From Swiss-Prot:
Keyword Cell wall biogenesis/degradation tagged: yes
Full protein name: Glutamate racemase
Record keywords: Cell shape, Cell wall biogenesis/degradation, Isomerase, Peptidoglycan synthesis
Annotated InterPro entries: Asp/Glu/hydantoin_racemase (IPR015942), Asp/Glu_race (IPR001920), Glu_race (IPR004391)
Top-level EC class as recorded in UniProt: isomerase
Gene from which this protein is expressed: murI
Length: 256
């Protein structure tokens, strides 16, 4: 009997669970190892060199778990580490791409707000993407230090208070399109829509998972409601706190 393909997913904490949820929508027979580096979260306010060391350490752990590929399910980790680690590891390393391209192409000439961590906002990867799209004048970059940490703590009331003035300001500027440049923020979609009802939200999860499955030659068939998922996953949260495992379970079952 053929062994299922084993894939590693990593994030600084809970954000990558939004990517895992996307992966579990497909009728694929995968074995997934998810590593949340909560002992060292959040990554978004650290130096890029420190993030690189942390991500390298997690990838070494996942390689010892005999995964065939690793997805950095974290925009900050991708910005700071993906390019370097692809040269160091013999297995494929995939990363996240903020959904700036579809947001710009689907809304020609219109402003697009990008919510992301300080590391993602200042790294060369993002500047290069904006330049390629000739979108430097259209993308409003908004750094959100501390917001991912509120998701890791499950403090959605504080997250809403944090976002309210940002969203009010965007509405005053007639911004209609919002890119979530951090996988943690995907869990804040309902809060965003409650405070900014007509905004169009873009995130990179769907495109990333399609690219991952295509690259690994895994059939892309969406599960229907009556099918059971054949993939299995293991959660490793290095905080080892019961609270985080409960929160992970809640986030994975959250309705979109």
């Amino acid at each position: 009997m053929k062994e299922p393909l084993k894939i590693g997913l990593m994030d600084s904490g809970m954000g990558g669970l939004s990517v895992l949820k996307e992966l579990l929508k497909y009728d694929s027979e995968l074995e997934i190892v998810y590593y949340g580096d909560l002992k060292n979260s959040p990554y978004g306010e650290k130096d890029a060199s420190e993030v690189l060391e942390l991500v390298r350490s997690v990838c070494n752990f996942l390689q010892k778990e005999n995964v065939s590929a690793i997805l950095l399910a974290c925009n900050t980790a991708t910005s700071a580490a993906a390019q370097t680690l692809r040269k160091e590891f013999s297995i494929p390393i995939f990363g996240m791409e903020p959904a700036i391209k579809p947001a710009i192409l689907q809304n020609p000439g219109k402003k697009v707000a990008l919510l992301a961590t300080p590391v993602t906002q200042r790294e060369e990867k993002l500047q290069r993407l904006k330049s390629e799209l000739k979108a430097e004048e259209l993308v409003l970059s908004i750094s959100c230090p501390g917001l991912a940490g509120l998701v890791d703590q499950g403090d959605f009331d504080k997250a809403e208070k944090y976002l309210r003035p940002i969203l009010a300001n965007l509405q005053e500027q007639d911004v209609e399109n919002l890119v979530l440049g951090c996988t943690h923020y995907v869990f804040l979609k309902q809060i965003i829509l409650k405070n900014f009802p007509n905004v169009k939200i873009y995130d990179g999860n769907s495109g990333t998972i399609k690219h991952l499955l295509n690259s690994l030659q895994v059939p892309r068939v969406i599960l229907n409601g009556s099918q059971n998922n054949r993939s299995i996953y293991k959660l490793i949260l290095n905080s080892e706190k019961e609270f985080h495992f409960r929160l992970a379970s809640e986030l994975l079952s959250l309705k979109e």
